[in-house]
């Protein structure tokens, strides 16, 4: 493999306006159509749907490998179920879509915003004793939220159409909290394969999931410095099992309340992946998830050259398909090679192969990496190994760049002025906090930012020195509190 052109990646000037760039990408790369005439509801186009299916397969694989079983619950939740858990209904009531009429009448129903209150009544019927636990279920479904804020494609929706929600049931708090820790590891595996960088934060009490004892969240930082929540895991304690009377017979012969968890991710993770790996030319898809891993572009300038080039392309395709690689031959005669290069770069295809008359004579192809635009000459006999090596290099580079960018955005500050300046510059700040909720909410107000919570991926404790709460100076700070502007 011979390097023909060193790295010269596209700039990222357009990503200074993330939402405008994202709309452009979704439209031009034929991923998603935002023109459907219902606010917050959008259309997945065929290329986008193939990408989504690959992400769903990743999610299913990781959950199946960790003892979860897939289920499918109805979209309708009876109001008598939804209204049972008081914290839950207070948290979701303003976002709920109600089915107020069906035919000549009927019961009052809710379009699920999430499924805790749908699943618990059924779980109650399935669990008899401790031998039935733990129970780990998941589904990938649509959920509905009556968003009143501005909606954005994949990011803030009224129909979240790729909502993976897992629900687990356990004998006690210890086992349920162990499951929350496993959920964190599950999400690490998924996001690592998507080449995403992330912070792990314990949400403050005022921002935890409605009905949870606590919430652990994954947040990523987009190029404009605003954060995007891409996953959450909740320890629900006995809050739902108590009101739905989900009990089990323990080994000692007594009936006990089960403990539950839930954890979810959605198409927000795909949005984060597209944006994180984006540039002025489009995006770069991680090779394992790309619908098309290799775009093959035959180059010929006469009818005489065409059969020679296309015959060699057949050899190239046979070698790559035989290795199980996903590829597409762009043999459109009404488009120039340069136009095709732009098109496949826009769509994020990790590698492009060019085959011209001179390449046929040398029995080689020219391979271009989408992430760096480096070019290599590769002999046909070495092609499969070279492609695998280059795809691994693309994946590693995407992941490395994402983590470097995220780490550069997180700063510790000691004063209100420093914090305001850093947030204005698109940073995530860590500030001293006493742990008092009123003080935490006051910090949010003073900074005009959102509290992400206590860091779970770095040292959360202030340590031995005498730091003061950023908002309540009379209180000694015990913890770091992360804040940012967020979507």
From Swiss-Prot:
Q: Where in the cell is it found?
A: Cytoplasm
Where would you say this protein principally sits, based on its record?
A: cytoplasm
Molecular function as annotated in GO:
ATP binding; proline-tRNA ligase activity
CDD domains associated with the record: ProRS_anticodon_zinc
A GO cellular component term found in this entry reads: aminoacyl-tRNA synthetase multienzyme complex
Catalysed reactions, semicolon-separated: tRNA(Pro) + L-proline + ATP = L-prolyl-tRNA(Pro) + AMP + diphosphate
Q: What is known of its domains?
A: Consists of three domains: the N-terminal catalytic domain, the anticodon-binding domain and the C-terminal extension.
Checking PANTHER family in the record gives: BIFUNCTIONAL GLUTAMATE_PROLINE--TRNA LIGASE (PTHR43382:SF2), PROLYL-TRNA SYNTHETASE (PTHR43382)
Membership in a protein family? Belongs to the class-II aminoacyl-tRNA synthetase family. ProS type 3 subfamily.
Relate the assembly described in the record: Homodimer.
Tell me what this protein is called. Proline--tRNA ligase
Provide the organism lineage as a comma list.
Answer: Archaea, Thermoproteota, Thermoprotei, Thermoproteales, Thermoproteaceae
**The encoding gene:** proS
